């Protein structure tokens, strides 16, 4: 495993107080975060979200995607249970990087959908590697998870990596006129679920 736990600190949020744990992928010099609420060391399945970094949605409040809305909803759902884990997966733009994401946005402005834009730039539909997230679960000794996701690929990869995903929990947020085509593409071309 090429992942190391580096440091931790308290992180108060509007929804609750988390323990923020920093990890580093040693071969890629890439950092990731685990935000822990409550005791996740028991055998009871942990409500968990793997949230891939989206600077435009998470920090700049973009309406082009549902990422920022999903992040807030995940924090809220975890805090309602008073126990959970949010992994902030630092693979921006489905792991094509911020500048390539801006290039993909420009192609979308010209009529391409999110999948077509990635392909036109020479990338796969989704370049993310969720094995690093599986390794975070293992380092934190999480026995079983209830995964907050609409993405069946996350579940498939985590199970393949030996993570006990006992339930998929829907993460449904409101759409808006700016992201309806994006959400439709995620459903129709990427197989995402959008029903509870």
Curated annotation (Swiss-Prot):
Active site: 126, 128
Keyword hit for Mitochondrion: no
Chain sites annotated for binding Zn(2+): 54, 65, 67
MF term (GO), any: GTP cyclohydrolase II activity
Residues where GTP binds: 49-53, 70, 92-94, 114, 149, 154
EC numbers: 3.5.4.25
InterPro entries, per database record: GTP_cyclohydro_II, RibA, RibA-like_sf
GO biological processes: riboflavin biosynthetic process
Entry keyword set: GTP-binding, Hydrolase, Metal-binding, Nucleotide-binding, Riboflavin biosynthesis, Zinc
Cofactor note text: Binds 1 zinc ion per subunit.
Catalytic activity: GTP + 4 H2O = 2,5-diamino-6-hydroxy-4-(5-phosphoribosylamino)-pyrimidine + formate + 2 phosphate + 3 H(+)
Entry keyword 4Fe-4S: no
GO CC terms in record: cytosol
Top-level lineage group: Bacteria
Pathway: Cofactor biosynthesis; riboflavin biosynthesis; 5-amino-6-(D-ribitylamino)uracil from GTP: step 1/4
Function of the molecule: Catalyzes the conversion of GTP to 2,5-diamino-6-ribosylamino-4(3H)-pyrimidinone 5'-phosphate (DARP), formate and pyrophosphate.
Name of the protein this chain belongs to: GTP cyclohydrolase-2
Organism of this sequence: Hamiltonella defensa subsp. Acyrthosiphon pisum (strain 5AT)
């Amino acid at each position: 495993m090429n992942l190391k736990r580096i440091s931790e600190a308290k992180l108060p949020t509007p929804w609750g107080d988390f323990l923020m744990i920093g990890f580093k992928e040693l071969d890629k010099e890439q950092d990731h975060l685990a935000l822990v609420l409550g005791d996740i060391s028991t055998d009871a399945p942990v409500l968990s979200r793997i949230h891939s970094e989206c600077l435009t949605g998470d920090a700049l409040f973009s309406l082009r995607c549902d990422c920022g809305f999903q992040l807030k909803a995940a924090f809220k759902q975890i805090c309602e249970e008073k126990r959970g884990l949010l992994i902030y997966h630092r693979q921006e733009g489905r792991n094509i990087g911020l500048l390539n994401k801006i290039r993909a946005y420009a192609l979308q402005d010209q009529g391409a959908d999110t999948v077509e834009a990635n392909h036109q730039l020479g990338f796969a539909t989704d370049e993310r590697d969720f094995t690093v997230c599986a390794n975070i679960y293992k380092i934190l000794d999480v026995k079983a998870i209830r995964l907050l996701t609409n993405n069946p690929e996350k579940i498939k990869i985590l199970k393949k990596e030996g993570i006990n995903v006992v339930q998929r929990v829907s993460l449904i947020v409101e759409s808006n006129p700016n992201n309806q085509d994006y959400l439709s593409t995620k459903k129709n071309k990427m197989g995402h679920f959008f029903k509870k």
